[in-house]
Amino acid sequence: MGSDGLQWVSRSLEHRPMTSLWRDIRHEVAAWLGSLKLAIGLFLAIAAASIAGTVIPQGESTDFYRQNYPDSGAVVWGFVTWRFIISLGLDEVYRSWWFVALLLLLATSLTICTFRRQIPMLKAAQNWKFYTEPRQLSKYALRTAIPARGTGPLAEQLRAGRYKVYQRDDLIYATKGTIGRVGPIVVHVSLLLIMAGAMIGAFGGYQTQRMTLAGDSFDIQQVEQSRLSLARPPDWTVRVNKFWIDYRPDGSVDQFHSDLSVVSPAGKELERKTISVNDPLIYDGVTMYQASWAVGAFKLRLNDSPVLTIPMQPIEAPNGQEAWGQAIPFDKDGRVALQMVTRGLQGSLMLLPFNPRTGETVREAATPARVGKPVSVLGQRLVIEELVGQTGIQIKADPGIPVVYAGFALLMVGLAMSYLSHSQVWAIYRDGQLHVAGRTNRAQIGFERELVRMVAAVQTPRPRTSDALSAAQE
């Protein structure tokens, strides 16, 4: 650039005030933030993040990811390692700073688009005016001029078509479906509500699962929370009064139930309900679902000993079915142990003596046992007093759910409103001619047919040549 060019730039900057420069910058930034391309890109990025949050287990320990997503050997998808997951925050996608930033950026984009585009379009639709000269209608592609006896018949046709008609002298303005201009605004507001509800749930809620024996209690305060959670769990506890399973005739599980009580710190029962699958207990914003079950323990009496409670552990059955078992010492020398196995809470077990040092069975066949019925094993009298069920309760608190539901309900309303066409019609009567023009924002063909039908209904027939000559002779 020569000296003349530099001098021109210098003079331009000197004569351009800083307020104007900042105004232009703000305008460009606002235009970019409110652009459709940015909004679509943000939607796609949020969708991709949500897929990652669905595929990758959330809220697990570092050891879990180190074990399931190793950084050597069989790497998942070739690049998804535990280091990759932890460094990008994919273990808590919906609470990560970048996911929150995407939501805030999308919310900003929708807000700017609403105020810069949708609201001005709504105001423009409401700020109508009469056209007074036929030439003013020439800017509309859909226009015509017909012989008529005035504007009255067309006004009647428009009212019959559910248009709101305004008349002044020989001028008409008619409109229908203005509420359709409100639809996009309602959609934007609903999306903002959904995102707000998602963020409230992410930072104000918690979710976990507890395995509890019948008769025991668990404290909501002990629920493991995310490191970014702002929620304060309640101080009441939950007592499992009873747990039982309904079985089908073939022995398969039909349904399982937990009788739960919500207990205050003072020991007062605040709420009680028997929950089952798809029938949770909801109290104080916390939902408790019946999620799983297990055989937690069994109670036995050996000869004249007191009742012993022995915990059960899940084991691998030969046929792949669920089973629980435990081995207990059965003699003083430690040469015999008794393996106890059950497949559920139906009340039956199999007892198998074996040598814990060699793993060899003491005798060939296992001894079946039933709850409450004595059985003899190697000369010892043994009674299984009870099989104690263990219930799996999923605990979830999400204060953002009502906001999300409200957002989705509003979204349905907004989408329905957006499908309504906003149609406008102008008419001017001059010198026996009715000049008509119209426009719509959607359903163009249907609007054209409607307008053609109304115009044809009010058009007066042109006089035939013979009638015109007769009139001239008279």
Curated annotation (Swiss-Prot):
<protein>
    <recommendedName>
        <fullName>Cytochrome c biogenesis protein CcsB</fullName>
    </recommendedName>
</protein>
<comment type="subunit">
    <text>May interact with CcsA.</text>
</comment>
<feature type="transmembrane region" description="Helical">
    <location>
        <begin position="96"/>
        <end position="116"/>
    </location>
</feature>
<keyword id="KW-1133">Transmembrane helix</keyword>
<dbReference type="InterPro" id="IPR007816">
    <property type="entry name" value="ResB-like_domain"/>
</dbReference>
<keyword id="KW-0201">Cytochrome c-type biogenesis</keyword>
<comment type="function">
    <text>Required during biogenesis of c-type cytochromes (cytochrome c6 and cytochrome f) at the step of heme attachment.</text>
</comment>
<feature type="transmembrane region" description="Helical">
    <location>
        <begin position="182"/>
        <end position="202"/>
    </location>
</feature>
<dbReference type="Pfam" id="PF05140">
    <property type="entry name" value="ResB"/>
</dbReference>
<keyword id="KW-0812">Transmembrane</keyword>
<keyword id="KW-0472">Membrane</keyword>
<keyword id="KW-0997">Cell inner membrane</keyword>
<dbReference type="GO" id="GO:0017004">
    <property type="term" value="P:cytochrome complex assembly"/>
</dbReference>
<comment type="similarity">
    <text>Belongs to the Ccs1/CcsB family.</text>
</comment>
<feature type="transmembrane region" description="Helical">
    <location>
        <begin position="36"/>
        <end position="56"/>
    </location>
</feature>
<dbReference type="InterPro" id="IPR023494">
    <property type="entry name" value="Cyt_c_bgen_Ccs1/CcsB/ResB"/>
</dbReference>
<dbReference type="GO" id="GO:0005886">
    <property type="term" value="C:plasma membrane"/>
</dbReference>
<keyword id="KW-1003">Cell membrane</keyword>
